[in-house]
Amino acid sequence: MSKYRLKVGAARKDVTPLPSMFPFKQADLNGDGQYTYARQAIHLRAVILDNGVKRFLFLVSETECGNLHYIKKYAMEKYGITEDYISFSNTHSHSCPLKAVYDPGTTLEEMNREVKMGEFGPESPVQQNEWDYGKYCFEQSIAAIDDAVANLKPARFGHAEGKSYINISRDELLPNGQYAFGTNPERPSDKTLSVLKFVDENGSMIAGIINYAVHSTMGFRVKDKDGNMAAYGDLAGEIANFVEEAYAIRGEETVVAWTIAAGANQTPVHSFFHTYHPDGSWEPDERYNHYLGGYMWKLSAHMAARQGNDALKVFDSISKLKENIRIDVAERYLKLPATKVTNWGLPQLFDDREIDDSKMHNVDVPNQFVYIGLKLIKIGDLPVFCYEGEMMVEIGMRLKEAAPLKNLVIVTCYQPAVDRDLHDRFHGSHYYVDKWGFENHTPSYGRNPVKDAITEEKVTEAMFDMFDEILNPDI
């Protein structure tokens, strides 16, 4: 048998909250909003690559699942997957329950004894339904890994890029010169649609991975005609479902995972419907306790179908597939100095009109650091760069241009499954702005935690170092 002969297995599991678990609290922005039901199934997907030398696990979820440290430990102990050959990520859907908290090493009561600090102060205690949902997601993650291993079969691998036009920059420039969340066709936007395709010996697709830079924010402020909010996988989930259903119609049962690229400041093209007045005043579409109607769900389905068809074209364009695939991995953990933006908090989050650029500036936070996990995976000739957190599209496009290998795929919202005592890495939703965003106070500036916006510089250095480790292992 040839060295590095590839086998691939995949599985999809339903992680929709059970009816008894509702209601769930929604985002702080939504005030009293709660999810009271699910309008579509929420999924997680596992894809395992085995080339006879190493196994690699991709676990992609439409919600943040369970305790990744214990999921990693399970995959390592039962299936011999080494720690660095495991990648967890989420699609960054804004329409799933905020908390899926579960730790098999403790109890709910013990977890709540310690008050955790969030971005805007102490976090609320974990509720029983959040714990139960976390346990369910944890169990489904384990089941997905088990099934993916059981489904391993000889495979071939190919990849390609295309274009999709459902995203736009959300750094909107207002008439008063201030930037706010909105839409801006003049700012950079990466239309690249990358796909990874794994087929069996008969040419049927075992699994696919889609990568694109856009937020799944279509449904998180929607109330139906009865005034209820619904959980679902949002835009990312609808795209994955569309492609899987298309292959099912062809007679191919496949698993398709959608991943978010460098899309921190990329919004769906049909989103943000601000109200502008002739006197120059305006009302932001996204503000506290302001809800939209079910038409947002229709727009989401429309864009999902558009990108679903785009993805099918790219998948179908792949004619060169290889069966002998080497897999190499390098990891880094960055420790960067922290900063805090003054005059930024919940009032500014709740209403962009409360932002006063003249009063916002950075102050150092002594002895505090921001940790960013990075992973570079080389699958055959394809580099995949995993990044913890949200990456601005400008940074992503420059990384692609600079990378030593072509067709760099950037997977953000990557979640390193490090031990809890290493550091507290889930203490807020952060945007790592570039120098331009830092200097111009784009909407993401207020939530940038890294001093002097040095993230891009340090990530670029680390990426080159990781490429060097993989491409020149004997030096």
Model-derived segments and spans:
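Conserved beta-alpha junction segments in alpha/beta enzyme cores
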Residues: 1-255, 259-302, 308, 315, ...
